[in-house]
Amino acid sequence: MKKRMFLGIAATVLALLGAGAFLARHRPSVDFAAAAAANRPPSIRPDYSDTVIPPNIAPLNFLVEEPGTDYAVRIGAARGRAIELRSRNAHVVIPMTRWRQLLEANRGQDLSIDVCVRGEDGRWTRFDPIVNAIADDAIDNYLFYRLIRPIHTVYVDVNIYQRDLRTYAESLVVSNRSFGGGCVNCHTLAPNHPGRMILQTRGVKDGVSYNGMIVVRDGEVKKVDTRTLVRPDESDRGRIGKAMAAYSAWHPNGQILAFSANDIFQFFHAVGEVRDVFDRESDLALYHADADTVTTTPDISRPDRLETFPAWSPDGRFLYFSSAEPRPQSQHKEVRYDLMRIGYDAATGRWGDLETVLPSKQTGLSITEPRVSPDGRWLLCCMSEYGAFPVYQPSSDLYLLDLETREYRRLEINSPRCDSWHCWSANGRWIAFASKRRDGLFARVYFSHVDESGRVSKPVLLPQKDPSFYDRFLKTYNVPELATAPAPASSRALGRAIRAPSDGSSRGATWQPPPTGKLQ
């Protein structure tokens, strides 16, 4: 009897919901032309207006921040049927299929959003259209990022996720819960080699070490401790042999990984952004995945310099990085990094000459996190007042350097708050970056289109199904990385590799000195 009553109530509820949905879809349409003109565009949140959007992005749902009792929205373009929505609340949720069809049919065209709001007096007000350009260039289908809490030193729920940018689907890549609650970070994907990825892990629990570099190559997943593959005297300071790999970059051939070995510590200020990080020592080296060996050269592991943030040119002929003169921690605000590069021949292993691309004395700022565009024309980097940890620098801005002319400029898309970690799409027409522009505390991911001349469009916030999502989401997005394919290994396989001994398939590997001679 109770079961029949429950089923009856459930059926009634479903019927009412269905009727409500039907009525919502079939409410009388609004005559936009007859509505009174507001003579201004509507206020919406997130601010998806006057920008360029990817043709393959998920629907840009938004809130209409105008008081009213009824809302009508029409989204249209030159080709195809417009999307018409009607709601008694300000949430605008766009149907996925119709959105995709509209954007795909109108690549390179404008997208117009018309909004009408009915006030308490029953009268409709029509706002000026919001117009965005639909790019002809697609953005990469996937975005990788780490989600962390904005705390100082406790590793709580440190997870790396991947998001399908065509939808709202988010899936776990790896969680620190799979190996005792340590740290997982610095995920790096190989350009043109979707089956390859690395990430770094840190942690010791109950006498078990989870420290190491997880290397994924075409189905094989293993943990490597780069410290065991280098002689302690490889560099004058031996930092490569003492510190684990940190920031890294795959060579375009997918066989070599440049990485930094850093000795850093966190400290705190009394006011403002209280968190900060100081780099006491850092060097660069190469991990050769096929041979399972590590090599370096004195020019990238000097005892009188700090070298970090490696980044390859798309042809693999140059390794870009940041370099600074070390100073005591009491002088941390005097540490400013130069932008450097050095030639490299992957076929012979020979190094070229060291070159200063852009000195900090010229900019007056610390230059970090260099990333070269896929066509080799542009270099995107961060500049901040000092140091090598721009995510904690409110002064951090994005700069674009023309590698042909060596001219650089501060991008117009920067905010008064921290704009930091960034990457390029595979086609070089989009950048993704982390920004704290909303509140100064939580970093969110934004996208901007970059045209052939280096002009960058107004940033687009990573869309969510619920347009009010970011108002209550209390985690920060860290290290956004675009990718053309999903993660090449399951979270279970990555967890097994993290928990495995770090020697594993690396047992018996030996250090190899670099070939003598330099590039001509």
Annotate each language-model stretch with its function.
Residues 1-13:
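N-terminal Sec-pathway targeting helices
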Residues 5, 16-520:
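Sequence signature of WD/YWTD-type beta-propeller architectures
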